Amino acid sequence: MNKSVAPLLLAASILYGGAVAQQTVWGQCGGIGWSGPTNCAPGSACSTLNPYYAQCIPGATTITTSTRPPSGPTTTTRATSTSSSTPPTSSGVRFAGVNIAGFDFGCTTDGTCVTSKVYPPLKNFTGSNNYPDGIGQMQHFVNEDGMTIFRLPVGWQYLVNNNLGGNLDSTSISKYDQLVQGCLSLGAYCIVDIHNYARWNGGIIGQGGPTNAQFTSLWSQLASKYASQSRVWFGIMNEPHDVNINTWAATVQEVVTAIRNAGATSQFISLPGNDWQSAGAFISDGSAAALSQVTNPDGSTTNLIFDVHKYLDSDNSGTHAECTTNNIDGAFSPLATWLRQNNRQAILTETGGGNVQSCIQDMCQQIQYLNQNSDVYLGYVGWGAGSFDSTYVLTETPTSSGNSWTDTSLVSSCLARK
């Protein structure tokens, strides 16, 4: 529901016949510290996502599930949609996690990556144990928050030591591989994400910049290295933008073929569209149609997953602390319909907001919708943790004290799974 009309509807419900105040559909109805309405509008029910947040879900019945309060486990209720357009699911999405950033630091949207600005989330990167502890963060996210997937962004230039089309640099790949192996050791899925915006130093891959052969060389080497690791997920490219989508789809096809031919025959590969991978533009900008033609060498689309991003601020940039939308009506609902019609799946590999109440409300609503539609949405990965510190507007980096970690409010309220 449009937030601008929600206060008017709420006021009307109070004035009309002296009725008890009711929360509107998708509005917050409970949680630790909540002092607003706890009764939901007719046709919806209050659903507890976790101890910090509950919301009014339309057309709901209740089922029992387990959530994690600050001091230990408890039993609460979670609402599940019974609408035929959004098939109910009690288990939610398969994958939930966070980006562990740092190897991508220094990369800008024109595909320039200054390797001297890389800030790896490896505690012992220089042997002095004073770098961010990305592996420790992942261990916390798995053990305390029930997370199952991590995206590990890295710049193309870093991996090949600025040698376009060259071999993986032995020093660089060994450092990056420490993060990958740390992720794998936790039993999680690990997304290798090339964070170059479909570019190298300003030139678009396969469109006047690096050749497809130079790009597939990178992916052939990475796929060969991780071919035996079933939980390594290949994220072809971060946020392509301003590309010819049909030409880009042809590039993606070459990469998929190269990965499979390198021996990584069954792992997940995520296919990114145009317009910064926007979930809201995936259909309208032609990405869905173009990338639907990408196949494995045998002609199947098994484990080829559409890769989308969506932030919750006013301009979808992920640069503002406050959130203004839950992205359901404008992005995830129409995309879910298209995915079902075409028997495909997608994963949300970047989403985030500030650690403020507006984002807790909107993000929890967005995550709840993805969980209710897990037949087409495989999961979500928040942005971001790793080498981000507490001053970053979208930080999801937990703070450590001794052997314990404390999550940000957005993670504990919305992204955590237990």
UniProtKB/Swiss-Prot annotation:
One of its GO terms (cellular component) is extracellular region. PANTHER family: CBM1 DOMAIN-CONTAINING PROTEIN, ENDO-BETA-1,4-GLUCANASE A. This is Endoglucanase EG-II. It catalyses: Endohydrolysis of (1->4)-beta-D-glucosidic linkages in cellulose, lichenin and cereal beta-D-glucans. Belongs to the glycosyl hydrolase 5 (cellulase A) family. Keywords: Carbohydrate metabolism, Cellulose degradation, Disulfide bond, Glycoprotein, Glycosidase, Hydrolase, Polysaccharide degradation, Pyrrolidone carboxylic acid, Secreted, Signal. SMART domains: fCBD. The active site is at residues 239, 350. The enzyme consists of two functional domains, a catalytic core joined to a carbohydrate-binding domain (CBM) by a serine-, threonine-, and proline-rich, highly glycosylated linker sequence. Disulfide bonds join 107-113, 183-190, 323-359, 364-414. Pfam families: CBM_1, Cellulase. Residues 22-57 form the CBM1 domain. Glycans are attached at residue 124. Residues 58-91 are annotated as: Linker.
